[in-house]
Design a protein with these regions (language model features):
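Conserved structured catalytic cores and adjacent interaction surfaces
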Residues: 219-223, 228, 256, 260-262, ...
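Hydrophobic transmembrane alpha-helical segments of multi-pass transport and channel proteins
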Residues: 99, 143, 147, 254-266
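Structural signature of hydrophobic alpha-helical transmembrane segments
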Residues: 33-36, 56-68, 262
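Membrane-interfacial loop-to-helix junctions in multi-pass transporters
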Residues: 33, 128-133, 263
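Hydrophobic core segments of alpha-helical transmembrane domains in multi-pass membrane transport
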Residues: 39-50, 70-75, 95-97, 137-147, ...
Length: 278
């Protein structure tokens, strides 16, 4: 294609496939990896609004448990906290996903009196025919997660963030001294400065992410109480069940739902504690 050339010269021919428009700042390319996180968050929000069939809910609950196990294994295999620098974002998405599942299971428990095979299996296995046993086991798991692991991990993250920020000026001065003495070159100095900045950002993010885990533990307790009390009200007043039958049915589903949500939450809390204590 003919285009106008410089002043005093003839027309030039543009090569095939060459863009004739002026080159500006290129827009960032949208890749599958970049779209995975927004798509996951949108899917979780949709899951909170739209009722899910029991088959899909069983699949998502199993996926939640498997993801928590994988996160725990990944946190145990890192040697430094920065080796898993995306852990705060991963923690946020996992917590949001678990809360979305809690909303979906609560809708099924109160609306239809069932919540799929996974929750029923967990409730039957742990309770062993006794409502008291199931509730006691659930409360023990909540106490372990909330009082022991979550509070400890939150405190470690707070102290780590504070000491990392306090130590930054001294580390920067040490890098400058090594650079001026010729011990390291410019590339190594840049790498060390970047690592220090990344470490401060990581512990600051983990400080906030630990608060999310703590709030998730509180939300789990509240949701369990809502499921139990709301199930009794729905069973007795709307479905006409006897108090004993309503207690047996909805306590089984409530304990199963609580265990299915608390076991992944416990695993991720342990992962958080392992990461911040590296």
């Amino acid at each position: 294609m003919l285009t106008a050339g410089p002043e005093g010269s003839g027309p030039t021919v543009a090569k095939d496939g060459e863009d004739e428009s002026p080159k500006g700042n290129p827009l960032p390319r949208t890749t599958t990896a970049n779209m995975a996180l927004p798509a996951a968050v949108v899917g979780i929000v949709v899951m909170m609004v739209i009722p899910l069939p029991t088959t899909l809910l069983d699949l998502l609950l199993s996926l939640n448990i498997a993801a928590a196990v994988l996160i725990l294994l990944a946190s145990m295999n890192v040697t430094r906290a920065l080796d898993l620098a995306s852990f705060p974002s991963l923690l946020l998405v996992a917590t949001l996903f678990r809360l979305g599942l809690n909303v979906s299971t609560t809708r099924l428990i109160l609306g239809e009196g069932e919540a799929g095979g996974v929750i029923t299996a967990f409730g039957s296995f742990v309770m062993g025919g006794s409502v008291v046993v199931g509730l006691v086991v659930f409360l023990i798991l909540v106490v372990i997660q909330f009082v022991v692991i979550t509070n400890g991990a939150t405190r470690v993250a707070e102290v780590g963030a504070r000491f990392t920020l306090d130590a930054m000026p001294g580390k920067q001065m040490a890098i400058d001294a090594d650079l001026n003495a010729g011990i390291i070159d410019d590339a190594e100095a840049t790498r060390r400065r970047t690592e220090i900045s990344s470490e401060a950002d990581f512990y600051g993010a983990m400080d906030g992410a630990s608060k999310i885990v703590k709030g998730d533990a509180i939300a789990g307790i509240v949701i369990t109480l809502i499921n139990l009390d709301g199930g009794l009200i729905v069973g007795v007043l709307q479905q006409g069940l006897a108090i004993g039958d309503a207690t047996s049915t909805y306590s089984l589903l409530t304990v199963g739902d609580g265990l299915v949500s608390q076991i992944p939450a416990l695993l991720i809390s342990i992962s958080s504690g392992i990461i911040v204590t590296r």
